[in-house]
Structures are given as C-alpha cells and as structure tokens.
Amino acid sequence: MSRKRTSPNRNVQIADQIQRDLSELIMREVKDPRIGIVTIQSVELTPDYAHAKVYFTALTGDPAKTQEALNHASGHLHNLLFKRLHIHTVPTLHFHYDQTIEKAVEMSRLIKEANSTRAKDDDEADAAAKDD
C-alpha cells in the first residue's frame, strides 16, 4: 500500500495559511506583555506537517523575550490553529527571530563604508597624480 504524497504546492499553501492565521491570532488572542508588535515573516513546514518553523520580526520589545513568549504560547496557538485549519495534522510551532532585516542593514552599512573608503582612496590617488 503506497502512501499518498503531498504536493510541494499544498505545503506552500498551508504554510501561507498558517502565516496569515498566526498573524491574526497573535494580535487578537495572545495577551503576553512580552510580545509587542510582531510580524510573521514566513513559515516553513516539514513534509509531514509535524513541525513548523515560524520566523518573526519584532517592531517593539526585546526579540529574545518575544521569542520566549511566543514559544510559551505555542501550545495555545496550536489549539487555535487546529480550530481554523482543516488538515489532519496541525504542526508543532517553533518560533525563531528573523534577523534578515538586521543583516541587510549591516551589509548596506559595510557596502557604504567600502564605497566611501574607495572614493577617498581614489581622491588621494588623483591628488598624488596631480602633484607629480
């Protein structure tokens, strides 16, 4: 007897639905003061839907405390998702702070710094060439 395989497209659809539902549920149902303004950036599901990595950013508050609070509320959120989603297995939620924005800002800063250093070196080289 062969097992029915889920399509990658269905996995993406369910992950997107979980992302939308979690965004709403966190805002309306979770009352933990450690959780400020949170945006769910993405959800990655395992193929069997047993686990979901939920990536978030926090506009306010400490990201580590927010992550701790979200992971503490994950059981409650799991139960609320179970009532909304019409799938056999609702994944166990694992929240992770998404550092993409901070990394992008740091990369931009490094590029800007490198460009200004290069421009300064070019100006010094031009000045030295004029002196010769």
Swiss-Prot record:
Predominant cellular place of this UniProt entry's protein: cytoplasm
The entry's keywords: Cytoplasm, Ribosome biogenesis
Compartment(s) where it occurs, according to its Swiss-Prot or TrEMBL record: Cytoplasm
Example GO molecular function: ribosomal small subunit binding
GO biological process: maturation of SSU-rRNA
GO terms under cellular component: cytosol
InterPro entries reported for this sequence: KH_dom-like_a/b (IPR015946), RbfA (IPR000238), RbfA_dom_sf (IPR023799)
Disulfide partners: none
Protein purpose: One of several proteins that assist in the late maturation steps of the functional core of the 30S ribosomal subunit. Associates with free 30S ribosomal subunits (but not with 30S subunits that are part of 70S ribosomes or polysomes). Required for efficient processing of 16S rRNA. May interact with the 5'-terminal helix region of 16S rRNA.
NCBIfam families: rbfA
Subunit and partners: Monomer. Binds 30S ribosomal subunits, but not 50S ribosomal subunits or 70S ribosomes.
Family from the record: Belongs to the RbfA family.
Name this polypeptide is given: Ribosome-binding factor A
Protein source organism: Burkholderia lata (strain ATCC 17760 / DSM 23089 / LMG 22485 / NCIMB 9086 / R18194 / 383)
